Structure formats: structure tokens, C-alpha cells
């Protein structure tokens, strides 16, 4: 018995201008998207990735580790849904954990657009967060740690209830490994100001579960360069990297107690960085 899943993250649909963006954090996201990211985050890679997933990879499920958009403007969510529509319509289960850009601001229109996006994206796998998705040989704990923060922070925050959920699932007498699906890495990355700005607050209990092996694998996004800290059985934490920036899909196969990772380009071919 085996389970194969494909992971992608941080597609960052390009920001669009809104007059309301002048009065909240969206203006910073708009500037970043327009002047720093526009030429290097290539949206056509989403189309190529979906073709590869549907035509050749054919996984049992897909994990999207968040950041569909740049400033959470409703038009960005509409564009992202249009690009992702063939994957949604395929019926392949999609597990989605929101990113900080998906919950960028408190504006009502943006929050409502996010909820519509979430409902359509996960139409075949609806769940409340935190939630559990099960296959015959794996358990996937899907969490939501995205919150609007001030303009200088790109943090997430894990609630005590989410940590309780992970501890309860990890404590179950179940032989199937537990995979945590989130946007923000559980493992801390130093004590610098830059590390804090992108950190996951309140994650110490979850990080301990990962370090103790009670969470077998943490699958996340947020950091745009793909990486992983895995042991000989493929257990640990995998950072997907940005699909549109780095042209990478992560294919993970679980078989005989081992997670095997392949890095692929958006054409489905082996990634030269692997």
C-alpha cells in the first residue's frame, strides 16, 4: 500500500490596485508585487504544473500550502480560482492551508473573497480547521495559522486549540503516521529580527511533536526557496518553495514506512536542483 501526494505553494497571484489599498497593509503588498515580484513570479507555471499533475503525476491527493494571492483583493482570488479550476474540477482531493497573504487584511470584502475561494478550492474535501483527512496509510492534520498582522510582520499564529488538536491526534493509538499540513514552518529558524518577522508564533508545542517524531512529517510553504530537513525515512519538515518563483513541485510517496521526495519542474520532469 502506498500514498502519493504532490505539494505546491506560494503561487502569489499578482496584486491588483484598489483605492482602499491606500489605507491598509495592501499598499505594501501592491508595491512588493508590482516592483519586486512581477517579473519573476510566473503565473504560466501554474498552468504547466496542473497539466503535469493531471496528465502524468496523477497523485492520490494534492497539498496547496497557501499564499494563493498577494494582497487578498477579491479580484486576485478570482484569478487564482480561474487558474486552479482544472485541478478543482478533476476531483483530486485538495488539502489547503491558508497563507499570510490569503488573510492579509481585516477588510470585509477580502475576508468574504477568501471564504469563497476556500469553499470552491476544497469543494471535494470540505473541513473546518484544524481538521483531519485520512487515507488507508496516512493521517493529514490540516491547520490554519494565518492572521492579519501589521505591515512589518509576515507572521502566523498557532492558537492553543490548534496545538491541542495536534497533540490529541499525535497521542492516538493509530499506526498511520501523522502528517501536518500548514503554511508556516513549525521549526524555528534562528533568533534574528528577520526570522521573527516570518515566524509562527505559539508553535512550541507543535515543534516539540515534530522533533519527537510524533508528527512524522510537516509539509509547509511560506519560504519561497524549497528545502527539507528529513531523516533517513523521510520524516521531518519539508518546505515546498514557491511554484511560480522557483518552478518546483514536490512529489512525495509514502510506502513501507518511508516518505520519498522527488523535486520536479512544472513540466513534471526531474528538477535539476534535486
Task: Describe each model-derived feature in a short phrase.
Residues 2-15, 32, 137-148, 179-181, ...:
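Active-site-proximal beta-strand elements of phosphoester/diester hydrolases
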Residues 35-37, 68-72, 146-160, 190-194:
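Surface-exposed cleft-lining segments at the edges of enzyme active sites
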Residues 1-77:
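N-terminal active-site segment of His-dependent metallophosphoesterases
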Residues 1, 256-274:
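A short C-terminal boundary segment appended to hydrolase-like catalytic domains
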Residues 12-16, 70-75, 96-108, 148-152, ...:
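Active-site environment of divalent metal-dependent phosphoester hydrolases
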Residues 10, 62, 67, 80, ...:
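Divalent metal-coordination and catalytic microenvironments
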Residues 1, 50-61, 139-141, 153-236:
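His/acidic metal-ligating clusters that form di-metal
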Residues 79-165, 205, 209-211, 232-243, ...:
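Extended active-site neighborhood of metal-dependent phosphoesterases/phosphodiesterases
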